[in-house]
Amino acid sequence: MGAPILYCAGPAPIMNCGMQNRSGSEDVASKKMADAGLPVIARFEVRHRNYLAPDGSINRPLPAFASDASLLTALYRAMVLLRIFDRKAVALQRTGRLGTYAVSLGQEAVSVGIASAMRGEDVLLPSYRDNGALIWRGVKLEEILLFWGGDERGNHFSGPVEDFPFCVPVGSQAPHAAGVAYAFKLRREPRVAVCMFGDGATSKGDVYEAMNFAGVHRLPVVFVVTNNQWAISVPLRLQTGCETLAQKAIAAGFIGEQVDGSDVVAVRAAAEDAIVAARDGQGPRFVEAVTYRLGDHTTSDDASRYRSADEVQTRWKEEPIARLRNYLVGQKMWSKAEEEALAAECHARVEAAVERYLATEQRRPETMFDHLYARLPEAYAAQRRELAGEGDV
């Protein structure tokens, strides 16, 4: 029997990924099987979705929701807020008032676009760079700052209470997402789990195990990979031999789609379709949002050591906020006065959140033991007592 032929669709015409490698040369083994007349038993496609060009022009007819000016401006406002929040968080870290921080610069469209397609009763399982999704879903800015300031109370945000906290070990939230979705299915609840992670997480076994389980049981879960081209300092070409990350869903038995992750309209549309399908009992979905990390991996990283300034400068031309602003201005949905008012509003909101964060009474060091076990083992209990200054141990 012949090997399945995988067809992938990107911005260019559909290419035969089963017969060619990245250089475009033909795979000798596949050609040999084809020449021998071995039958093709399956074909698969991964399609690429994009609506807005970097200059704000339209590549193809927009989805229905794009006629709602209030929604588009809400998406824009959320991305601007996230960027201003990021800048302030970095400033806090540089002045010793915040711990290591992961910026979202260049990736704002992914977390905001995905979250905007979710219902309130759905459950988000975010990665550490998905502040935009948390903010859209109602998490307070000061709660996010508490987390990055090393305070576990930041992981117990006031709402949505069933959303999961940030997951720092990459990919480890994927099995949790499958479990949440399994619970939804067993309870016959029309809810969806949305699991977000980066391209580096697709190299972890947790992700494949979760996807396989979800595929077998047709679970209402959407896996979203933010492909920002870099897993810290490791480029995508050293992470996978695949033409796309979306095609990894095929092995698990469900649909994967690639989307322009710098086009918030495309991200929202892909997320909406995937979530609706999962909610309607069509099984899991996988969305690969192709974007670019314009900033360092975190505030403890120096990306200039492993990528060129020219590469970053080129990618700045594709960034999501200017792209949507160009469209809104061109459609007379946004003005200079509104832009100035939004900037002032976002700065005021962020500064107020920072004041509340800095005014929060700091937790004592021994409280680090309070979020590990239901019953603390004696060895850890002794350490806790020592930190608390409760006498000899």
List the model feature ranges, each with a label.
Residues 359, 363-393:
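C-terminal intrinsically disordered, low-complexity extensions immediately downstream
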Residues 166, 171-359:
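Glycine-rich ThDP/TPP pyrophosphate-binding loop and its adjacent helix/strand module
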Residues 104, 343, 362:
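Conserved phosphate/pyrophosphate-binding and hydrolysis machinery centered on Walker-type P-loop NTPases
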Residues 20-124, 128, 393:
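N-terminal amphipathic, basic-rich helices that act as targeting or association modules
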Residues 82, 120, 345-352, 374-378:
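A short structural micro-motif
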Residues 5-7, 13-16:
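Short, positively charged and aromatic/hydrophobic N-terminal segments
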Residues 90-93, 333-336, 358-367:
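Surface-exposed helix-capping loop/turn segments at secondary-structure junctions
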